[in-house]
Amino acid sequence: MPGNSGAAPLPALEPHADLQALNTFGLPARADRLAIVEHPAQLAALLAQPDWAGAPRLVLGGGSNLVLTGDFHGLVLKVAIGGRRLVGDDDDAWYVEAGAGENWHDFVRWTLAQGWPGLENLSLIPGTVGAAPIQNIGAYGLEVAERFASLAVVSLETGASFRLEAADCRFGYRDSIFKHELAGRTLVTSVTFRLPKRWLPVIRYADVAEELAARGSVAPGPIDVSDAVIAIRRRKLPDPAAIGNVGSFFKNPVIDAATLGRLVAGHPDLPHYLQPDGSVKLAAGWLIDRCGWKGRDLGPVGVYERQALVLVNRGGATGTDVRRIAQAIRDDVSRRFGVDLEPEPVFV
């Protein structure tokens, strides 16, 4: 893993850089300058340059959780810090570190190939390792926070490097401190995961259980679970390389018991899931589908016909188009159910 010590040359700065290929929605936008950061020391050297002392900065990983609404007048930092290694173990877990620029899915499959299970439910999620804790990505009964040990970051304000433990990150549902107090103020350079030696499969979702059964997996191992999740995701979700999208566009809303009672009275078939804290999680895709949006377009952006949670670029869409259909969907769901949908991606 690249360290933070030693001299490193400044990364090349590309002026008036095209960002369309760097965001999975395929939205057109340009940046005043684009820097590809392959080593933490490059970042420190760049931040020391007076030309960029007060300039707006945007950290870009895989561009899979981003809606670009126009040109970015500042410096875009594309994270390309690589490397992955076992950094230690104890009686309970292996500790595995990866550079923030590593492809998330490739990293997950690599850990499984090494015999270090624990991330299999998060297979095929687009994006980079560094973005995973920022969003606290999750799928099929598991969140990154449950396998997280620590991360290394660089302050974009001072250039100082420091490490954050799990409690420091304030993880929540698709949430972390990086979306609040530290939003736009840091760049993650590496992440260390805690992968359990006493592994048990997480098969709480019916889709996963049914897929494993169809494959004849009576006592599934980690790779079996990963393969099942990959198959499910490929059936339900479009490949960003073929159809522009950012995966699930809306968070599943969390409500209280009183709101649930009101909703179930009018919609007895409403899917809902009780949470450990007594709150109730709803299926945003079901709400969107009931409002008639599944498979429907508004201009060049549409709701994917196989999964109502996903918005897709039908061709030539802009960030303004995405914002328009997202707001229209939110308005319809609010009018019909009295529930507010919150977008997952960040609008810039």
Curated annotation (Swiss-Prot):
It is an enzyme of class 1 (oxidoreductase). Its EC number is 1.3.1.98. Gene3D superfamilies: 3.30.465.10, UDP-N-acetylenolpyruvoylglucosamine reductase, C-terminal domain (3.90.78.10), Uridine Diphospho-n-acetylenolpyruvylglucosamine Reductase, domain 2 (3.30.43.10). The keyword Cell cycle applies. The active site is at R174, S248, E344. Its main location: cytoplasm. GO terms for biological process: cell division; cell wall organization; peptidoglycan biosynthetic process; regulation of cell shape. Its cofactor is FAD. PROSITE patterns: FAD_PCMH (PS51387). The keyword Cell division applies. It is found in: Cytoplasm. GO terms for molecular function: FAD binding; UDP-N-acetylmuramate dehydrogenase activity. Residues 27-198 form the FAD-binding PCMH-type domain. It holds the Pfam family MurB_C. It catalyses: UDP-N-acetyl-alpha-D-muramate + NADP(+) = UDP-N-acetyl-3-O-(1-carboxyvinyl)-alpha-D-glucosamine + NADPH + H(+). Keywords: Cell cycle, Cell division, Cell shape, Cell wall biogenesis/degradation, Cytoplasm, FAD, Flavoprotein, NADP, Oxidoreductase, Peptidoglycan synthesis. Pathway: Cell wall biogenesis; peptidoglycan biosynthesis. GO terms for cellular component: cytosol. Cell wall formation. Belongs to the MurB family. This is UDP-N-acetylenolpyruvoylglucosamine reductase.
